[in-house]
UniProtKB/Swiss-Prot annotation:
The keyword Secreted applies. Disulfide bonds: none annotated. One of its GO terms (molecular function) is endochitinase activity. This is Bifunctional chitinase/lysozyme.
Length: 25
């Protein structure tokens, strides 16, 4: 459902933030 899509997107953002914290935001 949509909840899973949102959760996936948040997880993706977290991974990107961990890999490249300077580009957060």
């Amino acid at each position: 459902g949509i909840e899973k899509i949102i959760s996936r997107s948040m997880f993706d953002q977290m991974l990107k933030h961990r890999n490249n914290p300077a580009s957060f935001g």
